[in-house]
């Protein structure tokens, strides 16, 4: 399963639609457990890094991102 991180910004639905087109199982989530247990993680972009970081910190998603990248889990950040 691929976790698409939901931080109230980004092109979530476009990424989800593309993954479904490719036959991939995915979930849009900000749930730590779903992100930690996913096989792969995608962080959709907004084109404004400062705004993205503000939202990630608001939901404390920066912590789970550090965790999954430290574990060398496949991680894709888009347009940040």
Can you say where each PLM-predicted feature lies in the sequence?
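N-terminal beta1-alpha1 cap of cysteine-dependent amidohydrolase-like domains
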Residues: 1-76, 80
